[in-house]
Amino acid sequence: MPRFTSNGITVEYTDNSGEVLAALENAVERGLMACGEAAVGYAQDLVPVDTGRLRGSITYAVDGDDCYIGTNVEYAIYVEMGTGIYTPGGRQTPWAYKDELGKWHKTHGSKPHPFLVPAASNHADEYRNLLKESLMNA
């Protein structure tokens, strides 16, 4: 057991810094997981639903000190950001396309329906409180 002597007083102590650090790391991970779960809920509330595939695909991942929210559905970016004239830097003229039945359609694009960015950014105070609560309970 380490000991320290000064002015005739000897103090013995136990170094628990490893356990304290591990407890803090676990608390941060639990807090980030709580943030991820909350963000997924907010995104699922905001996403437009047709078949439910996009809503059901929204997940989160914790990697170290970071929490990511996202989806693996290929069209999610078009829902989030819009297309054509409705997306920043998008095409500014209408276009035509033929559907699977051979019918032609003219479009300007689709309006954005943000669900990931607002879920991540509009609840910073709540996420901060979730992390704080997790650390306080470590």
Regions found by a protein language model. Give the residues of each.
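Short, Lys/Arg-rich flexible segments
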Residues: 1-76, 83-138
